[in-house]
């Protein structure tokens, strides 16, 4: 029987963080690094828990080099060859602790990932990424990967509800990717009518994961540093960004010049562009669930990184969190009808 859940679900745009008394004198006092010990792999990781999405325009080796200099993480896209990985491991061994090998849930994906992890044993993270993490097939795939790689930390998703977070953690995943349809180049919600407002999804999924000593990634929906702060405030352990890291020198693709403006291509991994590039086209039984856009060229990603980290430190000082770990404990969200003054855009 159809039913309606009448409880209000909110997105980042529906709330602001309430400022609170603070003993911090400066943003420079805020510690953004976190240390995690993962439930199933038993591995420990330290770093700033912001992840570049495993999309083939942004999840590049070039991006990983810059991110690792800030102790930030990159989920490298799944379309690099074994030789590409070997070359990267030889030239940038210092980056390998801050990257994940990405994989779909097919047999070919598993074989390819296995070859890479065998050739580059320093990589300890696996990102299992499918659009719909609710399928029985995916749960079984997570169990299989856990049995093959007992000491690797597994990220798996995407889902948006507590019961599926619990299922995937109990099946062997350590970190669950949360988000269905919030991405800047995702059209799942308009094509399928399926989705969940990201802020509420993060709050509910974090509660379920933390009860089992698991972790979550808020994946998608961030448009500015304030949204990243809200995701952490809602209980996300990691925040994954795609659109905010698009358009940079380190992104894949050439710079396009049009009408005197420099642009770079950015597209969703279920878009026509991605499926034509990697699967020879959109299969008859599928619909494209992603956009292809030309974004303004932003130069080196370094400035964007500093902007995001600076915003996050400032959030922590406003709410009295000396460490990023404390942000969710200090966060009180207020519902609003407007985010900011739009007189000048």
Swiss-Prot record:
Membrane-spanning residues: none
EC numbers, comma separated: 1.7.1.7
First-level EC class: oxidoreductase
InterPro entries, sorted: Aldolase_TIM (IPR013785), GMP_reductase (IPR050139), GMPR (IPR005993), IMP_DH/GMP_Rdtase_CS (IPR015875), IMP_DH_GMPRt (IPR001093)
Location of Phosphoserine modifications: 28
CC per GO annotation: GMP reductase complex
Subunit structure: Homotetramer.
Function as written in the Swiss-Prot or TrEMBL entry: Catalyzes the irreversible NADPH-dependent deamination of GMP to IMP. It functions in the conversion of nucleobase, nucleoside and nucleotide derivatives of G to A nucleotides, and in maintaining the intracellular balance of A and G nucleotides.
Protein name as annotated: GMP reductase 1
Gene this chain is encoded by: Gmpr
